[in-house]
Amino acid sequence: MKGSSALLVALTVLCICGLTRAEDDNEFFMEFLQTLLVGTPEELYEGPLGKYNVNDMAKAALTELKSCIDELQPVHKEQLVKLLVQVLDAQEDT
């Protein structure tokens, strides 16, 4: 249940940001995921979310989401990072 809630929060944040162009969407989403996996909540606000006004409730939700990700078993988090690298490499090839 916590994982489903975390995914819902992540998708909600993406919708709230109101991204419109496909390339920008992909770039934002990949930077957002990368920061979510290996960064800090503060890096989210300074990086991919830096140009958006993130309200206190959204910040609390992102902190909770980051906490859920940080509590993943190391092997699971490692696999998510590998998947992200694979996707990033595939994007560079196109």
From Swiss-Prot:
**What is this protein's tissue specificity according to the annotation?**
Expressed in the olfactory mucosa.
Fetch the Pfam families from UniProt: Uteroglobin
Task: List the Gene3D superfamilies hit by this protein, alphabetically.
Answer: Secretoglobin (1.10.210.10)
Predominant location category: secreted
What are the alphabetically sorted keywords of the record?
Secreted, Signal
Signal peptide positions on this chain: 1-22
- Signal found in the keyword field: yes
Matching InterPro entries: Secretoglobin, Secretoglobin_1C-like, Secretoglobin_sf
User: Where in or outside the cell is it found?
Assistant: Secreted
Its cellular-component GO annotations read: extracellular region
The text of the family note is: Belongs to the secretoglobin family.
Q: What is this protein called?
A: Secretoglobin family 1C member 1
Q: Which organism is it from?
A: Rattus norvegicus (Rat)
Biological classification of the source: Eukaryota, Metazoa, Chordata, Craniata, Vertebrata
